[in-house]
């Protein structure tokens, strides 16, 4: 029974690679400016030590543990080591404001937090403000925190893998819903292991592959797109602390990486360094995938021109629904603007506003990967999940050859550099300023981010508040990716016949005023 539970636990997903290549380097970590290499054997040993530490500290199966950690090997060790003890890790978006992170950890009733003091300026104060049973600290010591490495070194007996049922939760990533409020997706061990095998069929990795991660590890693009497939196959990857275009290109060349994944901004920004790119030996690079947001065909073309020997593709996926669209297994080329066709292992539907099957409509997905629901969000769970079908909120159409094409969102959410932005969320931030009377936010095109927030603001009479002051205000109080890049101070907002803000008119005016500027503003 213990062996069965081990095989059903996502924390042991790379067991086959561990047996084949135990002493092969799995991760080359560049955190702190120096290389730290971890073999498969070392990863397994430290994950097992984390599971034993959890039992010694009284962390029980089913309890949630928070992760305020940046891009470093400890993130991966803790993430999967937690699952080996039956705990449920929360890989948190360290770009969020302190108040939002505090709310998430408190709402999830986390009993422990692993804190990386370099990940968030308020990381320690966030952990201190919550009624956690235990607080673990990386790299440092501080009152009220246990030093992570010292605790890991404490002797602890071997443990049996906990019982894993079909619906046992593995981890809880956070995504944004129709309200823009982060919500925790309940992801199961069974669904995640099913997806690892599914991913290997359509986007196969090999022992000879070496990936490069510059995106945040809390993001699905990194965990689902590189960490799991590479470790499952027995390959290796380079882990960068963050993204900087020249360092990224240098990493691809120096470590002879065979593939890399990223959001559109990653590719747009490194294309600004074409001369440097051309000076590097990138002959090992075989494929690159762009995902997490709509990809302009012009960007795909530009990357292929810069790297003609590299296969460049786009992908579509959701935190709570996986990647239901994939390249055809028969090798047919994927048309520009399409992430692919429906996989036979995954049920998909397009429905119109009446819930009827249609040639164009909202994409619905059903497969073992789909989340069971959203933690402490019964109403959103009822809205998004019906009989196992996930309502993605994305409008697609399908051509006669079965290829899908993204059209828009059901709601007005948009993606800014791979991060979900909700206009209402940004508007509420603007409304919090005492000099703001009214505001409307809409997406405008941007060369790097795809879309960025722009705002029309009506100020209090007599106020001298400026657009730059309001930008700084939003940057200080909300996530950086959601702050309005452009603000127009106007005497009034466009209204429709019912006296409500005419968002369509506001969008048209903002795009007319700022689209050209936004397209030329790179790296914001």
Language model feature labels by segment:
Residues 6, 26-72, 76-80, 97-102, ...:
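Conserved AMP-binding/adenylate-forming core of the ANL superfamily
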Residues 7, 22-25, 155-174, 181, ...:
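Conserved pre-ATP/AMP-binding loop-to-beta segment of ANL
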Residues 32-36, 118-166, 273-274:
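ANL superfamily adenylate-forming
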Residues 37-41, 170-194:
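Conserved AMP-binding A3 loop
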Residues 96, 113, 260, 361, ...:
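AMP-binding/adenylate-forming catalytic core of the ANL superfamily
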Residues 193-210, 218-258, 273-274:
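Conserved AMP-binding/adenylation subdomain of ANL enzymes
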Residues 254-262, 273-335, 347, 354:
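Gly/Ser/Thr-rich phosphate-binding loop
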Residues 478-500, 517, 522-524:
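AMP-binding/adenylate-forming catalytic domain of the ANL superfamily
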């Amino acid at each position: 029974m213990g062996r069965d539970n081990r095989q059903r636990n996502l924390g042991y997903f790379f067991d086959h690679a561990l047996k084949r290549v135990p002493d092969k380097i799995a991760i080359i970590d560049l955190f702190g400016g120096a290389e730290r290499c971890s073999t498969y054997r070392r990863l397994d040993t430290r994950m097992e030590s984390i599971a034993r530490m959890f039992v010694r500290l009284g962390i029980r199966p089913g309890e949630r543990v928070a992760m305020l950690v940046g891009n470093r090997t400890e993130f991966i060790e803790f993430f999967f080591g937690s699952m080996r003890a039956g705990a449920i890790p929360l890989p948190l978006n360290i770009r969020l404001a302190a108040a939002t992170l505090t709310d998430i950890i408190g709402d999830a009733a986390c009993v422990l937090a692993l804190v990386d003091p370099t990940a968030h300026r308020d990381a320690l104060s966030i952990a201190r403000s919550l009624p956690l049973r235990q607080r673990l600290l990386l790299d440092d010591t501080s009152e009220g925190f246990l030093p992570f490495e010292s605790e890991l070194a404490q002797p602890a007996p071997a443990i049996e893998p906990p019982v894993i049922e079909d619906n046992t939760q593995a981890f809880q990533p956070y995504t944004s819903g129709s309200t823009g409020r982060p919500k925790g997706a309940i992801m199961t061990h069974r669904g995640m292991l099913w997806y690892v095998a599914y991913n290997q069929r359509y986007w196969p990795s090999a022992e000879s592959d070496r990936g490069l991660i510059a995106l945040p590890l809390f993001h699905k693009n990194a965990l689902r797109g590189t960490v799991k497939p590479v470790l499952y196959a027995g390959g290796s990857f380079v882990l960068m602390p963050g993204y900087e275009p020249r360092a990224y290109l240098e990493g691809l060349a120096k470590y002879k990486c065979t593939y890399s994944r990223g959001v559109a901004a990653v590719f747009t920004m490194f294309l600004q360094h074409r001369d440097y790119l051309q000076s590097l030996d990138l002959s090992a690079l075989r494929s690159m995938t762009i995902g997490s947001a709509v990809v302009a065909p012009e960007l795909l073309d530009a990357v292929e021109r810069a790297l003609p020997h590299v296969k460049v593709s786009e992908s579509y996926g959701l935190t709570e629904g996986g990647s239901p669209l994939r390249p055809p297994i028969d090798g047919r080329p994927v048309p520009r603007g399409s992430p692919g066709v429906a996989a036979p292992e995954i049920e998909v539907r397009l429905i119109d506003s009446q819930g009827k099957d249609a040639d164009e409509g909202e994409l619905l997905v059903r497969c073992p990967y789909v989340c069971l629901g959203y933690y402490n969000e019964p109403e959103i769970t009822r809205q998004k999940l019906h009989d196992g079908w996930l309502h993605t909120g994305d409008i697609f159409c399908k051509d006669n050859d079965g290829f899908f094409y993204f059209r828009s969102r059901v709601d007005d959410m948009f993606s800014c550099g791979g991060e979900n932005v909700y206009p209402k969320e940004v508007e509420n931030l603007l409304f919090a300023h005492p000099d703001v009377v009214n505001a409307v936010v809409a997406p405008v095109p941007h060369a790097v981010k795809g879309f960025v927030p722009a705002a029309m603001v009506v100020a209090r009479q007599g106020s001298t508040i400026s657009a730059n002051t309001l930008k700084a205000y939003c940057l200080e109080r909300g996530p950086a990716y959601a702050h309005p890049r452009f603000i127009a101070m106007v005497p009034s907002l466009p209204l429709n016949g019912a006296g409500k803000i005419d968002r369509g008119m506001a969008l048209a005016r903002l795009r007319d005023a700022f689209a050209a500027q936004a397209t030329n503003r790179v790296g914001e």
